[in-house]
Amino acid sequence: MIERVLAIETSCDDTSVAIVDRTGWVHSVVAASQDLDHEIYGGIVPEIAARNHSIALIPLIEEAFKKANMNWSDVQGIAVTNRPGLIGALIVGLVTAKSLSQAKHLPFLGVNHLEGHLLAPFLRDDKYAPPEDFGYPYVGLAISGGHTSLYQIKGLGDYRILGATKDDAAGECFDKFAKMAGLGFPGGVRVDQMAKAGNPQAFEFPRSMIHDDTFDMSFSGLKSSGQRMLEQLGPELVQERLPDLCASFQEAIVDVLIAKLDRAAKVFRSKRVILTGGVSANSRLRQRAQEWADKKGYTLVIPPLRYCTDNAAMIGYVGALRMARGEVSALDLGPSPQALASDFK
């Protein structure tokens, strides 16, 4: 029986390793950030990301075992992200997992990165545990640099996509605006920080599809509007009004996300909702979502920051659950830039 796994996450630019029980208990989770390596380029360079994963991964595995005070005899399997993500980055994690699987005579399983985000609220450690009454079913909004989607989660492997962005992801929109405004990388964090000193009503930005009777979203118009606004103001005025610009731009994104989450919770009569993914670390989104949930009487779960951003703990939890019911991957498993058709309904 699979009780505990070593987990590897290398889908984008963060290298992460964790040791996780199928109960969701995280014995250790460690990570190596590449922000400084990509900052000078204003975004993620896939080849650099893959190269850095290959350098960081083995030392992180050793660190994860040391931090958990465990060794290879304490795990019964290996979970690794194999989709979706940057192909070069995924290959590093996948090849490492396969090699360790063969060397240590342990089964391994490829895990969908997005499924990890959807089940991240169930993770627990010395400082975090989900509410006692939290469980299936629930509505989840997964928001990151590459994905912005609404789901209905009924159980392990039982996920329904309700809606998604038709173009740019919310995280991508934050990053592009930050780059155009000269804030650098990572953009979402910089906009969030700058916005705290600004007025969210100072500038008017579009909120596409906010009143649409679907769960879909669109952020490309907002990105274009942000570019036009910056060009119209000019460099000097942009710098002078940067806090207001960031606050107003951020508010437009948050308004759309909250509106779609509210619609989904109403339509599916869900009293339990989650925010997950890297953008759920945004302080304004967290504040607005909590205010909304308190007003509506919903149970809102937002994992702590360490489990919102890309991390191996969520991959390990999904992997441990699936391997405990007999699922394993073959050695010919490959990486995929997209989720599989069978992953979601």
From Swiss-Prot:
Quote the record's cofactor note: Binds 1 Fe(2+) ion per subunit.
Q: Does the keyword Protein biosynthesis apply?
A: no
EC annotation from Swiss-Prot or TrEMBL: 2.3.1.234
Pfam families cross-referenced by the UniProt entry: TsaD
Q: Which cofactor does it need?
A: Fe(2+)
> Known NCBIfam families for this protein?
gcp_kae1 (TIGR00329), T6A_TsaD_YgjD (TIGR03723)
This chain's protein is named tRNA N6-adenosine threonylcarbamoyltransferase
